[in-house]
Amino acid sequence: MAEDLDKPLLDPDTFNRKGIDLGILPLEEVFEYLRTSPQGLLSGDAEERLKIFGPNRLEEKQENRFVKFLGFMWNPLSWVMEAAALMAIALANSQSLGPDWEDFTGIVCLLLINATISFFEENNAGNAAAALMARLALKTRVLRDGQWQEQDASILVPGDIISIKLGDIIPADARLLEGDPLKIDQSVLTGESLPVTKKKGEQVFSGSTCKQGEIEAVVIATGSTTFFGKTARLVDSTDVTGHFQQVLTSIGNFCICSIAVGMVLEIIIMFPVQHRSYRIGINNLLVLLIGGIPIAMPTVLSVTLAIGSHRLSQQGAITKRMTAIEEMAGMDVLCCDKTGTLTLNSLTVDKNLIEVFVDYMDKDTILLLAGRASRLENQDAIDAAIVSMLADPREARANIREIHFLPFNPVDKRTAITYIDSDGKWYRATKGAPEQVLNLCQQKNEIAQRVYAIIDRFAEKGLRSLAVAYQEIPEKSNNSPGGPWRFCGLLPLFDPPRHDSGETILRALSLGVCVKMITGDQLAIAKETGRRLGMGTNMYPSSSLLGHNNDEHEAIPVDELIEMADGFAGVFPEHKYEIVKILQEMKHVVGMTGDGVNDAPALKKADIGIAVADATDAARSSADIVLTDPGLSVIISAVLTSRAIFQRMRNYTVYAVSITIRIVLGFTLLALIWEYDFPPFMVLIIAILNDGTIMTISKDRVRPSPTPESWKLNQIFATGIVIGTYLALVTVLFYWIIVSTTFFEKHFHVKSIANNSEQVSSAMYLQVSIISQALIFVTRSRGWSFFERPGTLLIFAFILAQLAATLIAVYANISFAKITGIGWRWAGVIWLYSLIFYIPLDVIKFVFHYALSGEAWNLVLDRKTAFTYKKDYGKDDGSPNVTISQRSRSAEELRGSRSRASWIAEQTRRRAEIARLLEVHSVSRHLESVIKLKQIDQRMIRAAHTV
């Protein structure tokens, strides 16, 4: 076959030139044109075809790296700095002084430094993201060398034979072969929400999703030659402005408006009133522009998100949408599946509890029938549990010939096999949901009451039920409906809770995240699982969501019922969507876990869609975050890390707003009251050193909030105004003491510099530099900044920057910047002054936060730190233990100081504690009864365990 590969028909463009449409030709001709067979390709042939057709992925537009670099200097904040640069060489060119090339060069350097850091960090983040997304690459089962293999979909070529099953995203355009009809969701291509039925010979398109069925297909087009690829080339990508970008824009606009107000005041007073010279006035305006613009903000925040995304991936949570980190930090409700998330999804069958419904069968026969109705390959948890109960897994197909296998689908909720036994008789066996199997059976009315009674008895013990039935097929045809179905038995399935689920749920509740169990199992099973996990038993059937329940809770509004419930049972995918929708309407930030194709709508609707480990391709494509490790603890760890990331971003925004207000107000007052002119070049030095230091905040050591986070812009602006005003007044006071008093000369024996404007500028430079950079230690902490150790990198950067600033102030003699060194004694005085006025910043922070939220003093006293590393679970010190004092607060206190969501979480946590106490009490009573029955001396036991 390899020697035929050079024939022109395999050229991707040949089919178009010759008018050959592989989508409508008979299958025999398709195989002939593609020179393949139902046995698939050989690896060598596939490799040669891959060279001809290229990888099975859409062509990515290569962006010019230089244009991309320039793009980092094209945003509103950069525009202001670029305007300042133009002012330095154009407007400042007067009075025979010439353009201000020094300031122009400094501004350009500042822009280039920020653009360079942004460029390289985004490249690194992009490479890291590409590596992470490679782990989520679409997989497919392909028939190569006569064997089925799981491979990346990118290696598919025309002529490959692939397997398509429930939940798969179709990896390439293909024609269906022998097998059951498929239900295909083509909404991504056509916009049509209803799935369409596809049978043998029909074409399926890349990007659509298999909703039901299982079948083989031959690939006829890959990559950009697929229907999806051709469509994508006609559509220009559009950038959607997300919430995070809106936040950045709002903060940037606030800073720009603050600077504009200061500039207008200076222009109005300096020129008409004070009659200042033109060049000096321009220099004062440059000080506000250069010092007030948080030019590093886009870089700092994007780098923080990128580093946080990498940290999450190390914890088993891959972020597909970067801003999902911000939303996860604010999540206050988590709707999670029971199976696989709260439990191990490692099912076991208790053979002793199997119920047999036909006289001529025993428990082993029931197990054998269930095994025959199970897959031996690509097993789900139920198939694996059933087959493992057989003495030898091969027994499931021993002495029979399989004719047809019906895989599980969410509609029928059962699997079935048609087979011929050793006597040549035809049978069909099925296993699945008891309700579905019972509806098939002829004796339904006679046995229904007994079946439901057994199901309820199993459910009270936390056991799921699996029904088994069979029928004879006298017509000996796979298409025959067969004879009457016989209900054979019920198998109990036990899915044990994860060992850490109970503790993790309590931790989530204490963090203000309500965990709601969403399960398709019975209500009794859900309540029993909730009791075992200690998450409460306030659960309802799915019918209550539609107002169909007639119990004592029917008077409760649906939205309130959903908000207060611990979980829901018997849930279908449409119920999940409705739960998310109602919670969002009640202003909750909702996370939803899912693994199946039918979970996709709810995952898309949720603020944070979370695809659990081993989720289907459809669920992964709809989710914002994909878990690589099972269990709830991964999600809670991701919540803590997201809050830490959010805290870093919030800390920086408060810092940036404070510095803007401080520069604008402080230097405007100095220019208008004392007619003091600070050199613009020195503001540039401050900005460069500040930006270099503040970049390290992306790796700072922070304390995640004990409650869900959100962008409270009004609070950020108000905090920035208060702190910035204080710092501005401190700087103004410092200037006044230097030029109008002899305080420093008398008490510290330094020489007077009041009449030396260049030395005054050096002193002002050092004071502004110290207090500006030290402010980050205040904004980064929720308690006393002296007692919360920053990250090592931040400390190191601060020391280096301030060492440079101090050396400049002490020794510099820069004529064009008009500064002269002030010596070490003055530097020591300035450091002492800055330290004295640094201390009240914490007090101002507490008082202001207390005025806004009433929580500040609790934060002062409560210094427990929540960890962000999964490896730290279970440690006593430095672990994510939530503050004990928060657990003991009353509901009234919570109503007054937190959101309603946190209050609900507290109520849920209390119900969970009650459920746990009941569990402990029941175990205790059981132990006492055993001790009495065995006539064991309890005093000996107590003595042996007494310290």
UniProtKB/Swiss-Prot annotation:
Catalytic activities: ATP + H2O + H(+)(in) = ADP + phosphate + 2 H(+)(out)
GO cellular component: plant-type vacuole membrane; plasmodesma
EC number: 7.1.2.1
Annotated InterPro entries: ATPase_P-typ_cation-transptr_N, ATPase_P-typ_cyto_dom_N, ATPase_P-typ_P_site, ATPase_P-typ_TM_dom_sf, ATPase_P-typ_transduc_dom_A_sf, HAD-like_sf, HAD_sf, P-type_ATPase_IIIA
Modified residues (Phosphothreonine): 946
Residue positions where Phosphoserine is found in the record: 897, 929
UniProt key word Acetylation: no
Free-text tissue specificity from the UniProt record: Found primarily in developing seeds. Expressed in guard cells, mesophyll cells, leaves and roots.
Keywords (A to Z) from UniProt: ATP-binding, Hydrogen ion transport, Ion transport, Magnesium, Membrane, Metal-binding, Nucleotide-binding, Phosphoprotein, Translocase, Transmembrane, Transmembrane helix, Transport
Subcellular location: Membrane
Class of enzymatic activity (EC top level): translocase
PROSITE patterns associated with the record: ATPASE_E1_E2
GO molecular function, one term: ATP binding
Family note: Belongs to the cation transport ATPase (P-type) (TC 3.A.3) family. Type IIIA subfamily.
Function: The plasma membrane H(+) ATPase of plants and fungi generates a proton gradient that drives the active transport of nutrients by H(+)-symport. The resulting external acidification and/or internal alkinization may mediate growth responses.
Protein name: ATPase 10, plasma membrane-type
